């Protein structure tokens, strides 16, 4: 992290401020964990609010302070007042205003100082202070460094729990290539603050309702392979969602199952979103297979080398056909 930027932010935070913390739309554990950790760190000296563009999964409601999150979609009037009064806005775990969806306009029009802290590639230039490092395992690891620089003595169990959750989620429990020796060191330091590692694992992974278990079975059964390419993909249709009483977060982690097959380098999940008239796409990979480039080029998306997302405005059948053609072309261009 740039010490000059950190010193400037530290100076701004030396007096009481009205602060908003914003995760990306449909926040995951890293985004929400980062926001909640910073919320706990700042709340005693500042007026702090977390505004999420939309609702987050029930799975993450075990995180300390999650009940304080304001959801813009359902609490617009309250949120608008906070935006009007804000002096500082932190955008966490995203580097393009489009990732904030319905809140992006409020950020761009605000007179508040905007501070970006994020670990994705190719950040947009929208923030007054930009802390960006795509080599970091997670935004939560970056927030640990940020808090430790400002005042490490304030790190308590609540902060540690939120950060540890974000780190283990984004590193696949410390198994993804983004995990470094320093990531493990930060995890160790957080455990020293009383983090209940077993409790977090249980909440993140052993949380299936019976309907979700059946949906997983359907998703696995739907996996297809394209010829002899090292690619698997699967679909969750609107009908699948209705029959399983689908809730936000129910498909979390499903795409990873494709990578457990020997010889497979890329796994893709298509989720039909009829209400939004689009297909949500999750890409995962390993080795040299760069799904962020593929997602950006063909499906208006992006992300990390081994984890990315995208969307399609075509119907599910046409999206599947487009994907098959595109992935063949991509592999021919980049890997032949």
Model regions: which residues?
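Hydrophobic helix-and-loop "lid/oligomerization" segment in the mid-to-C-terminal part
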Residues: 2-25, 31-73, 77-88, 169-336
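Solvent-exposed alpha-helices and their adjacent loops that cap or buttress functional pockets
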Residues: 81-83, 106-109, 123-124, 154-157, ...
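Short alpha-helices
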Residues: 117-186
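Short acidic, glycine/serine/threonine-rich loops at helix termini
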Residues: 33, 62-64, 103, 126-129, ...
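A generic local secondary-structure boundary/capping motif
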Residues: 78-80, 103-106, 130-132, 152-154, ...
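Glycine-rich, phosphate-binding/catalytic loops in enzymes
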Residues: 38-39, 106-109, 132-133, 185
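Short, motif-level signal for alpha-helix interfacial/capping segments enriched in acidic residues
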Residues: 3-8, 95-97, 147-150
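Active-site cofactor/cluster-binding pocket
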Residues: 70-129
